[in-house]
């Protein structure tokens, strides 16, 4: 298996040396969908974090208002 990987790596290095532009274009075309998926997932995660923070702030404010109302009732 190591021989197979070594041969494959040598082939890639040879290909990159003989046709660098073709190699780079192929690598970029192969990686572009992964970059797009990463961007979409990062955006979704940011939105989820923002929503969670809003909910936490809303709950905190609600708890503060409840505590404030209880204090005014006792007085």
From Swiss-Prot:
Compartmental location: Membrane
A Pfam entry, by short name: UPF0542
Keyword annotations from UniProtKB, A to Z: Coiled coil, Membrane, Transmembrane, Transmembrane helix
GO CC, alphabetical: membrane
Membrane-protein topology: Single-pass membrane protein
Similarity comment: Belongs to the SMIM15 family.
Official protein name in the record: Small integral membrane protein 15
Taxonomic source organism: Xenopus laevis (African clawed frog)
Organism lineage: Eukaryota, Metazoa, Chordata, Craniata, Vertebrata
Gene (name only): smim15
């Amino acid at each position: 298996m190591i021989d197979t990987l070594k041969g494959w790596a040598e082939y890639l290095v040879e290909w990159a040396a003989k046709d660098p532009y073709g190699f780079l274009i192929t690598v970029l075309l192969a990686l572009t969908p992964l970059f797009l998926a990463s961007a979409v997932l990062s955006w979704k995660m940011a939105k989820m974090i923002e929503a969670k923070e809003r909910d936490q702030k809303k709950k905190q404010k609600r708890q503060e208002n409840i505590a404030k109302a209880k204090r005014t009732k006792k007085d």
